Amino acid sequence: MNKGKIENIKDKIDGNELDLSLSNLTEVPVKELAAFPKATFLDLSCNNLITLTPEFCSLTHLIKIDLNKNQLVCLPEEIGQLVNLQHLDLYNNKLKMLPIGFSQLKSLKWLDLKDNPLEPTLAKAAGDCLDEKQCRQCASRVLQHMKVLQEEAEKELERRLLKEREQEKKKEAKQREKEAREKEAQKKKKAEEKERKRKEYQAQVAAVAAQEQQKKKKEEKKKKAAQNQGKKAAPESVPKAKRSICSLFFSLLLKLVLLLVIGVSSVVAVCQLTELRKEAFCIPLNVHFEETVRWAQGLDVVQQVIQKMSDLRT
């Protein structure tokens, strides 16, 4: 507020009216006005106001406000806080739209929006304000229009919030899918790593087994070679040992047979040629000897031998 032009607000009060019109104001002295709550009619017409601050809406004691012939291009969203406002003159400003909060002015009974570049739907709802009746109708229609806009805004806000929630859900779902894919990839990687280690372990075990098998084969070859060498040496010694044993056995046997033959021949000779042939022990022997001789003479082979011997003598 230009304090040089308005020295004392109190001097501008007449009853319940505070007249600050034609004061060349570019902003409203909200703090000073709040000190006079009994001044329920505020005249700010014919000034250079472009906007109203949100703090202006704290002057809830105001019932009537005249803002005609200013340069207002917008009203604060908080204007709905002026719950006691019944009369609002906005004639000849530069307003195109009204804030959604305007629908909260439930006490508003009179409104003038003439000579403002209003957007078509708002201008149609406002209509003319050439007399008291039309201005009252303007207030009613504009409030109704703003309530519809508020409902649409709330629905749009709800749709936007719903869309944002859906987008957030999709984002969360994508994040979960991404995490699941990463988890699955990590799990697969671990499984592949485990399989690789298992194959390496099996390869190591197989290599060790192959080495053991080769070592075993080499040992078996060495053992077989040693056995073959032993077998080659053994046949040479074993037959010699066998031959020596057999020779010794046959030699002893032959000697025994010769001794037996000599013994038997001696006994037979004694019993046949000496006077002992009449002895008791020689009689059976002589009988057996004679039987043996007769049996031998009966053999063809013996006869052939005797014949050959006779032929040789002649």
Curated annotation (Swiss-Prot):
Signal sequence, start to end: none
Alphabetized, the UniProt keywords read: Coiled coil, Endoplasmic reticulum, Leucine-rich repeat, Membrane, Microsome, Nucleus, Repeat, Signal-anchor, Transmembrane, Transmembrane helix
Q: What superkingdom does the record give? A: Eukaryota
Q: Which residues lie on this side of the membrane: Lumenal?
A: 269-314
Subcellular localization is given as: Microsome membrane; Endoplasmic reticulum membrane; Nucleus envelope
Provide the membrane-side ranges marked Cytoplasmic in the record: 1-247
- Extent of the LRR repeats: 14-35, 38-60, 61-82, 84-106, 107-126
The UniProt entry lists the main location of this chain as membrane
> Which residues lie in Basic residues bias regions?
215-225
- Check the record and name the SMART domains matching this protein: LRR_TYP
Presence of keyword Lipid metabolism? no
Record field: transmembrane: 248-268
Q: How does it sit in the membrane?
A: Single-pass type II membrane protein
Query: Cross-referenced PROSITE patterns, in alphabetical order?
Result: LRR
Q: Which GO terms describe its biological process?
A: intracellular signal transduction
Give the record's GO CC terms: cytoplasm; endoplasmic reticulum membrane; nuclear envelope
Q: How does it assemble?
A: Interacts with SGO1.
Q: Briefly, what is this protein's role?
A: Required for nuclear import of FGF1.
Query: Under which name does UniProt file this protein?
Result: Leucine-rich repeat-containing protein 59
Q: Which organism is it from?
A: Danio rerio (Zebrafish)
